[in-house]
Amino acid sequence: MTEIIRTTLRDSKAARWTALLIVAFTMFAGYYLADVMSPLEGLLDKQLHWNSADYGWFTGAYGWFNVFLFFLIFGGIILDKMGIRFTGLTSAFVMVVGAAVKYWAVSTHMLDGMSWHIIFWSFPAQVWMAALGFAVFGVGVEVAGITVSKVIVKWFKGHELALAMGLQLAIARLGTALALSTSLPIAKAFGHVSAPILICLLMLCIGLLAFFVYNFQDKKLDASVVSSQEGLVIEPEEEFRMKDILNILGNKGWWYITILCALFYSAVFPFLKFATNLMILKYGVAENWAGSIPGLLPFGTIILTPFFGNLYDKKGKGASIMILGSIIIIFVHFLFSLSFLNHWSIAIFLMISLGIGFSLVPSAMWPSVPKIIPERQLGTAYALIFWVQNAVALMFVPAFIGWVLHKYCIVGSVIIDGEKMTQYNYTIPMLIFTSFGVLALVFAYLLKAEDKKKGYGLELPNVKS
């Protein structure tokens, strides 16, 4: 008897990697905008008179709608109910709208001299409007992120799943790296902080078009799946139900990954928001080059995240990889907190080390979620993880660090390039980041113990032999 070999479009390496590259560009553009203001804190102080509290408030606005209005969770439910194509296009469009509002707020003079008091907080009107645009953008980029995660699972499950997720993260972080290393020179070349934001806006428009292109690929994949099942008796796949949310929330392994994610990203993303000023004020790096040192971190992950993802695919040890990454995070931030270690070469060494830790944890964490959660619930499961991450790492922690710097860490002022800047002592913030690493290590061990108990297979390879 001859066995019929049934293949789908996802079995073509060229097809699945092409699909990945298309959606990865959209995330590249999104990550660029997410961090484009990070090296501009000093320039915002000089040109727009933003202090560290203003900057921290603006940075924390990224998660406002995702956290308080639950837009991210709704986005995950929409993804599971409406599908990848609808959700991907919608989220890419929302990113463009948010970027446009942010650009207008920073570039216009209509808001000059105005201050708004909303609920309990008073900030310049320009800060509020820029924060609003960033919050709208945050909805789009986070929903796009969970959509792309589900895209990768759809195309790569049973293949190079962790490698694909690692490469997507690497391409996205190339956007972060370029933002950190190019936004300040671009702003200075054009004479205003709004210039790099305009470039981001144009890139996001191209990213929106990229999702239109992906939709054709996705339709072809669905058609090939239907064709491969002709003549077979296929049980209908269970649809997502609202009670599945309770099943996700009742999964202890999911909680450990979620808390680990929030703690890990709390130790990295908020740090990057303030890292350029840290390089200038503590390590004496010239302002034009200060963003290049934090830019080493995402550049390192471009190589290392796919490498560790490929290692997880072939060798396993996902929980152990997350433990090692957490240990490196602790080591790096503790050394950053030591005031006598203030030479620029030490900053480079620590940033490269942080890049290794930053590569280890996500390369194993994101591909582990499909081992714990059924595929029909993945969109909502990722959305809930991202919601907690938004609430803690992307909203609360940046605002908290900005408040700590403004309240407890001002030690005077300094003249840089002929202009006055506030001088900060970064010891307390670095110790806060260190504590996040310690807690992340605890939950990484708890996850490994839960995997041993439940048999999720986090320590097993992803590629089917």
Where are these regions (language model features)?
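Glycine-rich segments within core transmembrane alpha-helices of 12-TM secondary carriers
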Residues: 162-188, 386-398
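C-terminal ends and interior cores of transmembrane alpha-helices
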Residues: 93-123, 327-341
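Helix-to-loop junctions at the C-terminal end of transmembrane segments
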Residues: 69-84, 304-317, 405
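Symmetry-related core transmembrane helices of the 12-TM Major Facilitator Superfamily/SLC fold
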Residues: 194-213, 427-445
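C-terminal transmembrane helical hairpin of 12-TM major facilitator-type secondary transporters
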Residues: 318-365
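Cytoplasmic helix-loop-helix junction between adjacent transmembrane helices
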Residues: 127, 133-171
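Extracytoplasmic gate region of multi-pass secondary transporters
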Residues: 37-41, 251-305, 362, 366, ...
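Juxtamembrane intracellular "pre-TM" segments in multi-pass secondary transporters
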Residues: 2-13, 222-257, 463-465
